[in-house]
Amino acid sequence: MPTINQLVRKGRQSETTKSKSPALQDCPQRRGVCTRVYTTTPKKPNSALRKVAKVRLTNGFEVISYIGGEGHNLQEHSVVLIRGGRVKDLPGVRYHMVRGSLDTQGVKDRKQARSKYGAKRAKAAK
């Protein structure tokens, strides 16, 4: 335990928090190019084929990004926008694709939570 004098001289050093999405480098989103689009399986209690893409960002980072929603149009060389946000049951996936921007289309026939999936409002039937 330090003495008062030692604290006056040095002071306490505050712990710096590590970023959960370092590839964004404090930006809200980053643009990148898909290098590989594939499906992968989640961790133990869950079972599915989750759609993910390996993305080379404009700042040189290469990250794995999750493609949310039902169906997508992405392939190799698609230009995409990624945001932070991990997928709990996919190890190594710390980013999400932004649907409805750049080459990523919005989710078709989406009625609720449309803004999260880049879906336009459906025309009212008359």
Swiss-Prot record:
3-methylthioaspartic acid-modified residues are: 89
Q: Where is this region: Disordered?
A: 1-28, 103-126
Residues annotated as coiled-coil are none
Supply one GO BP term.
translation
Q: Which CDD domains does this chain map to?
A: Ribosomal_S12
InterPro entries reported in the protein's UniProt record: NA-bd_OB-fold, Ribosomal_uS12, Ribosomal_uS12_bac
This protein's GO cellular component annotations are: small ribosomal subunit
Note one Pfam family from the annotation: Ribosom_S12_S23
GO terms (molecular function) for this protein are: rRNA binding; structural constituent of ribosome; tRNA binding
Q: Which keywords belong to this entry?
A: Methylation, Ribonucleoprotein, Ribosomal protein, RNA-binding, rRNA-binding, tRNA-binding
Biased composition, Basic residues: where in the chain? 113-126
The entry assigns this protein to a family as follows:
Belongs to the universal ribosomal protein uS12 family.
Record's function text: With S4 and S5 plays an important role in translational accuracy. Interacts with and stabilizes bases of the 16S rRNA that are involved in tRNA selection in the A site and with the mRNA backbone. Located at the interface of the 30S and 50S subunits, it traverses the body of the 30S subunit contacting proteins on the other side and probably holding the rRNA structure together. The combined cluster of proteins S8, S12 and S17 appears to hold together the shoulder and platform of the 30S subunit.
Q: Could you give the subunit structure recorded for this chain?
A: Part of the 30S ribosomal subunit. Contacts proteins S8 and S17. May interact with IF1 in the 30S initiation complex.
Q: What is this protein called?
A: Small ribosomal subunit protein uS12
Q: What organism does the record attribute this protein to?
A: Burkholderia multivorans (strain ATCC 17616 / 249)
